[in-house]
Amino acid sequence: MSMMKRESLPEDYIPYIRHINQHVIALNSRCLMTVMVVEGVNFDTADIDQLNSLHNQLNTLLKNIADERVALYSHIIRRRETIYPESQFFSSFAATLDEKYKKKMVSQELYRNDLFVSLLWNPASDKTEQLASFFQRLAKAKKTQSEPDQEAIRKIEELSQDLIEGLESYGARLLSVYAHGGILFSEQSEFLHQLVGGRRERIPLTFGTIASTIYSDRVIFGKETIEIRHESNERFAGMFGWKEYPSKTRPGMTDGLLTAPFEFILTQSFVFKSKAAASVIMGRKQNQMINAADRASSQIEALDEALDDLESNRFVLGEHHLSLAVFANHPKALAEYLSKARAHLTNGGAVIAREDLGLEAAWWAQLPGNFSYRARSGAITSRNFAALSPFHSFPIGKLEGNVWGTAVALLKTQAGSPYYFNFHYGDLGNTFVCGPSGSGKTVIVNFLLAQLQKHNPTMVFFDKDQGAEIFVRAGGGKYKPLKNGQPTGIAPLKGMEYTEKNKVFLRNWVLKLVTAEGQTVTEEERQDIAKAIDALGNLPHAQRSLSALQLFFDNTSKEGIAIRLQRWLKGNDLGWVFDNDQDDLNLDSQFIGYDMTDFLDNEEIRRPLMMYLFNRILDLIDGRRIIIVIDEFWKALEDDSFKAFAQDRLKTIRKQNGMMLFATQSPKDALNSTIAHTIIEQCPTQIFFPNQKANYKDYVEDFKLTEREFELIQSELSRESRRFLIKQGQSSVVAELNLRGMNDEIAVLSGTTKNIELVNQIISEYGADPDIWLPIFHQRRENQ
């Protein structure tokens, strides 16, 4: 293009020489630099009081590290995110679901905001250092040969640690050197490469200067537009700078940019001034206003107050600059994006200017340490800087390096950002899910479980009302709907090996049967039960039944063990529960579903049944990856066996590589339990769905949601939006699951009574292989 005319050599404008160590980089000005990546805080789900408190903390941090030899740069790099978590699935349904969902997600424009803060230590700002620098120049020492002293390195490392600790609420860490495929790469160089060429890629450590390594794209400057040429494409950029500062600042003035539908780099720098220099600057400004007979006496008084605040160490002063570089693949699109960006930047009252003659300087001023290129700068307070750079963002989750590996699922946030969902928060994967009927809870829980199949876990699903039956069967699992009056296929006396541990369990289980109506047993009867279990273990496997067990007891006593066992024997009113020909819990299957809805209100059957089921499930918690899902778990919590299981396993299952997921319609259901505290404490991942009837006490006081999070759940999020709140630790985000057009998959993820009957009919005709019956199900469902 004709307007593109000037091209520069990297060493002329890029000041970075080499790594001093894994964290520290040396500049040709003798400055040292470290860079931190910051997760940020989600302003969208935080209370105003929380944001104001963070603003004050940030101002305090800036005051604590203030030194005229220190400078800070903050960057927000907004970029397209196209990475989708790839995996293999153990069921064809999960694989097909993922394939369709992936096509939907990669077709959308998702953007992420990467936040960075760079710390620079400039020893030349010290008077003695300036003198040393003068003699160095006299000796014509080459910049690349100047060696930083150990004291300067120690100082910047110390300051970096202070900054990391001060930014704890924001999740900051130092960029470093890392190995990949046997080669060393530099995270700092990758960050700087984005500033130089607007593109992200791996940058290896080399023997040459960092400057020459990171300048891999040609940057050509026109009058108002920058062209960046890469071997495979070209991009265009335009820049804005602040011409006049707003009269007041508040946290979040630039937050509108964080949801913009284009890529950009927002750069800010803050070079600390000494108190003496700050007093001179502010005094000069005050005198100018007085001499000009400025009518705004309130501004003069405000400067008086500011000088007093400066002397009282309520803030520090620094030289600040702000620029915004906007990127597009075509000049026409760039013009559109720049128009939108201008609106966001002027929203806070600042006067901005499109860079033209100063375009090249503005571009290179984005690089930390290029102080002389900052053409548009002004003195502001640390409170102002904390407001202009508040490290606001949206959580994006974690793509790689999770306890079980790659992210479970990619979701879209309310802000159009990607969110890489994981059940695990740290090493704890227990999850609490809460949403009223019709909120989309079932679809989303089952979708996440289908995505979890990529990690090849054993999955145990305790269902209610058979809502997950189609999903379990389609996912290659075995499903056992336990119905009143129908043989359960459960025979505990045949299902367990007669080890000493298991015999103790079986004794207690038999005690449960013979005391179901409130009876008691004598010590002699306890011993009789123990002897009977021992004797039963000597029989052939096929003969180990309740009917056989009864024969070991005295049947002459009207209230004895034999009589009490009678009703549990085959042919009697409860014989269908446990006195079956074989024990078939499907524990050899990787995906198991049980529906116990019929028994939840039948305590007599529920107690021994759950006692046995959860004891057998314990055998699966042996170090393999496992998730245990319990729908409407509050009902199960009425049972002592489940309550004990939940309380113990919630605390210990992570050590055995497992996790639990509890789902319910109302938080009060969980809160009414005696183990409510354990559930809240041991489920760091919590998912809440819209609920117009949400109770403030339940959500805010008991589950510790912020008032803003409660507001979202109660009033802002609608059921139709299919949006929900994910909270992990203190961080939260509003995400959505868009399965529009995927009607076949939705019919599997959320089963209706009609569809469940249809599936069972088809399975009775064609067998249980989902690869065979699932296509027939979709065909018949559509024809209905």
Curated annotation (Swiss-Prot):
Xref: Pfam families: CagE_TrbE_VirB (PF03135), P-loop_TraG (PF19044)
GO cellular component: a single term: plasma membrane
Main location per the UniProt record: membrane
Keyword Nucleotide-binding among UniProt keywords: yes
Cell membrane in keyword set: yes
Induction and repression of expression: During the interaction with the intracellular environment of host cells.
Compartment annotation: Cell inner membrane
Keywords: ATP-binding, Cell inner membrane, Cell membrane, Membrane, Nucleotide-binding, Transport, Virulence
GO molecular function: ATP binding; ATP hydrolysis activity
Endpoints of the signal sequence: none
Assembly mode: Interacts with virB10.
Family, per entry: Belongs to the TrbE/VirB4 family.
Protein name, UniProt field: Type IV secretion system protein virB4
Gene that this sequence comes from: virB4
